[in-house]
Amino acid sequence: MLYQRLAYYNMQWYAGSPHLRCLNVGKPDRPTYLPLEVCQLVPLQRYKKSLSTMQRSKLVEGSRQKPLDRKLSLSRALRDNNYDSEPMLRECGISIAREFMQVEGRVLQAPQLSAARDRELYTPNGRWNFNKDRFIQPIKVKTWGAVNFSARCNVRDLVKRLIQAGIMKGIQMEDCAADVIEEMHQMKWETPAKRVEDVFQQIKSSFKQQKPGFLLCVLPEKNSDIYGLWKRKCLAEHGIVTQCVVPPANIKDQYLTNVLLKINAKLGGLNSLLKNETTRAIPLVSKAQTIIFGMDVSHGSPGSNVPSVAAVVSSLGWPLISKYRASVRTQAPRKEIIDYLFKQVGDDDQGLIKESLIDFLNNSKGQPPEQIIIFRDGVSEGQFNMVLTDELTKITEACKFFGSKHFGGKWFPKFTVIIAQKNHHTRFFLPNERNRNEVNNVQPGTVVDKGICHPRNYDFYMCAHAGMIGTTRPTHYHVLHDDIGFSPDDLQELVHNLSYVYQRSTTAISIVAPIYYAHHAAAQVAKFTRLDDMSETSSSHASQAEPAPVPELPRLHPDVASSMFFC
């Protein structure tokens, strides 16, 4: 970017450098350019914005420790700090042991997974693959196309290989070589909005009157500015399921399988099922119609005034617990408690819970759920009471309102509320004589519910996944409310099962799938709109007496609203 030299800079700074690039210190839509030679970078500033994918990767890589290394460093810290010599602790009668606390735990048996033709997927160490198996419910993709925003990818070759890999997994994809749309070279220097709009004009011309059922989108890089605008165009404006990819230079079969896992789930298929789903052997859940909610709130970076995004994910098709849908809303910045679970407007409810219940009825022959299980992420212990008095109350009101509209006020479901926490410092280490696995982490399926848990309330720790790098961090589950009446064993089995139904992966995950899906749904829909612009709008109202209105996100098109678009 060139800058115009003023007389001041001619006299005070380098007169022979008019072509140096400038530093943009303004907003994306209001740039402010400063000459580089007059700027200084102040050291030791805290960076508050989101890190890039590469930065996050380097941060995690630099901070991870293998279990034995972490255990040794903790032992060394206890010894070197000599907490027992602290006068205040001694005065209070508090002593800190230098040895790790021994606690009892048990390892749950991994649930059985089924692929096509009732073949069992082998799950050693919480991992499996589809090398010789097909997806249990593969989809047919008839009308679809591919869009290329990247100059480095041979999209036609990618499409050909994807179709071949799909055949191996049971997915029937028609050849769309004629419907590969390349971005015109001259558009690469335009704004992301113009680039997306131009490509969609080509799509309309290519498909004439028939809307494609699926679009594969090849992006030039991760975290591309095109991503959010493309998703909004497809999901909100046109109702087209889409999968964005940034293919590596050397595309391997496993990469294609991972892409197909997402495509199949987004288009309504299922990759695998728990055997006890189909045999109705999940304790309590398989005995009565049950809906499972996953709820999460995504916030902007610290210090920003960006609206928070709340997502509610709910299960479809009882007795299955593997298929979900999502609803998303914005709310006040940094607010953790979800606002729009129940929102009565006149004689109607426009809240998140109603949308979930309607889709559940449509997939259960009009029968309402008798049991509602709620998994909530992202709240601290100081907010537990607010979850019960605010969120559970709103969900109860939404169900009561829904029951009065559809079932004559004679529907009274039972509720169970469970909080999942990952942001804690508890770690488990195997005793030395039992360090037999490759990285010395606890085995997947490890549960601890004694010794370090609350003396009165019901909580437990679970390591459902296999920690292959670094030290496994368990998820801490707190049961705040339980009308259904789960026994500890039954609830732990349900949580363990829900760690194996994450359709976009072939590994057990560290937290139940509904919560992971809620996180993905909030993050993806938030990118529909430039939230930086929302932040500026909110800031412009900050000095006014009345609070700034929270901008709403675009609603999903009806054709994709019930899909697993977030997968």
Regions found by a protein language model. Name each.
Residues 1-567:
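Long, low-complexity, intrinsically disordered terminal regions
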